[in-house]
Each structure stands twice: as C-alpha cells, then as structure tokens.
Amino acid sequence: MEIILKIGILGFGAVFGYLFGEVDLLVKVLVCFIVADYISGLLASGYLGELSSKMGFKGIAKKIAILILVAIAHQIDLILGTHNTTRDAVIFFYLANELISILENFVRMGMKVPEVLKNLILIFDAKSGDEEEKHDKDMD
C-alpha cells in the first residue's frame, strides 16, 4: 500500500510539473492565495449566515479554472519558447484577483484591511502588465 501511495504522489508531481512548469515561488504563492481565498470565502459566508454547498462548488470550480488557465499559459510558453513569461503574467493577474477577493471577504466580516495589502494589489497588477510587455519584447 505504501508503494502505491508513493507512486501516486510521484505521478501527481510529474503531471503537475508538466502542466505548470517549474513549481517556483510564484506557483506556490498562487496555490496559497487560492486556498486562502476559498477559506476566507467560507468564513465570510458562515459569518453572515450565507453558507451554501452550491456557492462552495462554484468557488471550487473557479479555482480549478484558474489552474487550467495557468497550465494553458505554461503550454503556450513552451510552444513560443518564452520561458514562463505568459504563465507568470497570468499568475500575477490571478494573485491580484485572489488578493482582492480575500480582502473583500474580510471586509464582509466587518474587518479593516491594512493599506499595505491594498497596495500589493496594484503591484501584482503592474507585474501582470510588465510580464506581458516583456513577452511582447521577446516576440520582436
């Protein structure tokens, strides 16, 4: 049984690596943001008495869609030979998007949000554009 588990984990890692490329800091942070957004959404919905399995399923579907788009972006980078430029731009876009959602969830619970976190949204958003501009230059 232990061998089957190890083979399964190894297989998952291989597929994950193929789909998303190098599991670098950006990928790890995106996964953390995705999990944090889902949990903060559950907390806010529970806090407000709005928790439902339908909303939970929609949340999971959106998170899977984000990962699919990151995987597609990585595959595009492989085709174009742009070394994760497209993937990183997509990741920065979704980092900003997930951070906005996380902060909104805490505001829904009546919490104040530190300005430094609000400012990070602008930084991630700018990085998303920077990566796209870098990609455009690579194509010239």
Swiss-Prot record:
Segments crossing the lipid bilayer: 4-21, 26-48
Subcellular location, principal: membrane
Any Gene Ontology CC annotation: plasma membrane
Topology with respect to the bilayer: Multi-pass membrane protein
Statement: the UniProt record of this protein carries the keyword Transmembrane: yes
Pfam families: Phage_holin_4_1
Subcellular location: Cell membrane
Keywords, ordered alphabetically: Cell membrane, Membrane, Transmembrane, Transmembrane helix
Family: Belongs to the bacteriophage holin family. Cp-1 holin subfamily.
Protein name: Uncharacterized protein Lin0175
Organism: Listeria innocua serovar 6a (strain ATCC BAA-680 / CLIP 11262)
